[in-house]
Amino acid sequence: MAREIAQMNKTTVIKYLEYSRGIDDEIKIKRNIVEDLEMCYDTSAAINYDGMPKGQNHISNPTEKAAMNIPDYVRKEIREYTEEIEQLQKLKCEIVKEVLRLSLKQKQVIMMFYFQDLRWVQIADLLHYSERQCKNIRNEAVERLLVIFQNNKTISNFKIKE
């Protein structure tokens, strides 16, 4: 783990900030995949539930059949996607939490540039600074986030897939 932390630098911090912008979309895609996998093996839609006898453990027969119809490899894949979704949600939460620890100016610049995807001209106009000042504020924020991200286990242990 010490080796991973030593490798974090300003470029890595910027990659995490840029990556965080697309996390919500990635989560949506993975959720859709999970739903599609579950629907492929869900036979309960074609079954009439009224007056159906109950299965073992007080689970209705259709539910029991649907659970048994999912092959182990698909169940494993669903579990892996679900774990990835949880990791992505946790990462996004941690990145936002750490950004919120910055000073007001730094927080505004980072949020506008990396999360809202605004251009330097727009940020400078909104904050009433020059573009150069905004870039300097961003550089200071990235320096501070470098230390903060290194100390955050969730962020420092997460590997961005390229």
Kindly label every feature range from the protein language model:
Residues M1-E98, N151-E162:
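N-terminal interaction/assembly modules
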Residues L91-E94, L102-Q106, I137:
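N-terminal positioning helix adjacent to the helix-turn-helix/winged-helix DNA-binding module
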Residues C93-K97, L118-V121, H128-S130:
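Catalytic phosphate/metal-binding cores of nucleic-acid and nucleotide-processing enzymes, i.e., regions
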Residues R101-L118:
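Short amphipathic alpha helix immediately N-terminal
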